[in-house]
Structures are given as C-alpha cells and as structure tokens.
Amino acid sequence: MSNDPTHQFLIQKIVPIEIGGIDFSFTNASLFMAASAAVAAGFLYFSTSNRAIVPGRSQSVAEMSYEFIANMLKEGAGKQGLKFFPLVFSLFMFVLTANLLGMFPYFFTITSQIIVTFALAILVISTVLIYGFYKHGFHFLNVFVPSGVPGILLPLVVAIEIISFLSRPISLSVRLFANMLAGHITLKVFAGFVASLGALGAVGVGGAVLPLIMTVALTGLEFLVAFLQAYVFAVLTCMYLNDAIHPGGH
C-alpha cells in the first residue's frame, strides 16, 4: 500500500478501451460507481421483497429511508415536490452508499472525484431548469427577482441572484468532493503514523497509541460525515427543486 495519502484517489484502468481515439476504459471509478448503484438497489430490493407487518431490521431501514426523504421533500418543496421523490431518493442512496463503500480498505471513494460530484450537481440543476421552464415558461425567471426589493436596487439584486444560481452546481459538487477528500486524506495520514511508529519497535508502539486512538475516532467521524454529506446533498436538492416548483417564492 502506498504511503502517499493521495494515492487512494488515483483513477486506474481495469479494462483499457479506446474507440476512435477516445478513451472509454473501464476504471476503478467506473467499477465503484456501478457497485454503489448495485449495492443501493440490491439492499432496497431484498429488504422489501418479503415485506412483513412487523418489519425486520433491513425492512425498517428501507422504510425509514423512504419516509426520511419523503418528509424532507415535503418540508423543502411542499407536497408538489413529491413528484421528484425518485430523483432525490436515488441521489441520496447513491451518494450515501458511495461514501460508505469508500470507507473500506482498498475500496475507491468515487465522491472524492470532482467530476463525479459535479455530474450529480449538473443533473440536479438541469432538472430544476427543465422543469422550471416547462411548468412556468418565462415566468420561471421570477426566481431571480426577490419580492419586496426597491426598484433602484433591482438590477443589482437580479445580477447577484443570477450569479448565485449559476454557482449552485459548483458549491453543491465542491462541498461533497472537498469533505470526502479531506476526511480520507486525514484518516490516511494518521493511519500512516500508526504504521510508521509501530515499525520502530517497542518505543514506537508506545508512541503509536495516540495516532491509533485518533484513527479510530476519525473513522467513526468519517462514517458520520458519509451520512451527513448525503443528507446535505439531498436537502440542497430539495431547496433547489422548490425554486422550480415555486419560482419567485423567496
């Protein structure tokens, strides 16, 4: 295993594929994107395939996840937001599963790749724009015109709102990417201290106790962050979808 804390984020080809000079290689990132989707879908399928009146653990988790996102959508976008439940629920489960899989040794954390998180953010913003214009036409542009703004300040406020809207995919993607990247690098550094000090013998083993405690604590924290980042991504998605459903409502 490499001592470089950034080595874990390198994209490596598993099956090299080149078509017309374009690289379509199947990589470790491709593998774990597929694995994240498969694990999330598989868990939901098997946990609900034999539904019981008194649910077991897996069924309870699946039902709690469903209700969690449904309530989040109702609070963030109103009852009309429930039409986007498949999108938000799929994003939440995919991001959460990808984050959790990345916690295991030798596994790849796809949410530590800015291109992956940016693609997810673009999917969200594209949905907002397409639905907003489809449902409201050019009245959707009212999302850039907050109510109660004095006329003299309106041009400035509209410009700020447009810039804020355009920055959403950047902030949405960078937030997830940066948190997963920083957390895994920190965890790798402390784990490296444990291995390096342990290799020094008895004295080193004694000195490795503190880094080991920090590694265990950070591991627990990273599992919490894995959930929180999926939660934040879903919450912000609901907020953005609310603009498409109720433009000019802020």
From Swiss-Prot:
Protein's membrane topology: Multi-pass membrane protein
Pfam families membership: ATP-synt_A
Predominant location: membrane
InterPro entries: ATP_synth_F0_asu (IPR000568), ATP_synth_F0_asu_AS (IPR023011), ATP_synth_F0_asu_bact/mt (IPR045083), F0_ATP_A_sf (IPR035908)
Top-level taxon in the UniProt lineage: Bacteria
Keyword Transmembrane helix appears in the UniProt entry: yes
Alphabetized SUPFAM superfamilies for the sequence: F1F0 ATP synthase subunit A
GO molecular function annotations of the record: proton-transporting ATP synthase activity, rotational mechanism
Coiled coil: none
Keywords from the named record: ATP synthesis, Cell inner membrane, Cell membrane, CF(0), Hydrogen ion transport, Ion transport, Membrane, Transmembrane, Transmembrane helix, Transport
Protein location: Cell inner membrane
Function, as annotated: Key component of the proton channel; it plays a direct role in the translocation of protons across the membrane.
Family matches, as NCBIfam families: ATP_synt_6_or_A, PRK05815.2-4
Family (UniProt): Belongs to the ATPase A chain family.
Protein name stated in the entry: ATP synthase subunit a
Organism: Rhizobium etli (strain ATCC 51251 / DSM 11541 / JCM 21823 / NBRC 15573 / CFN 42)
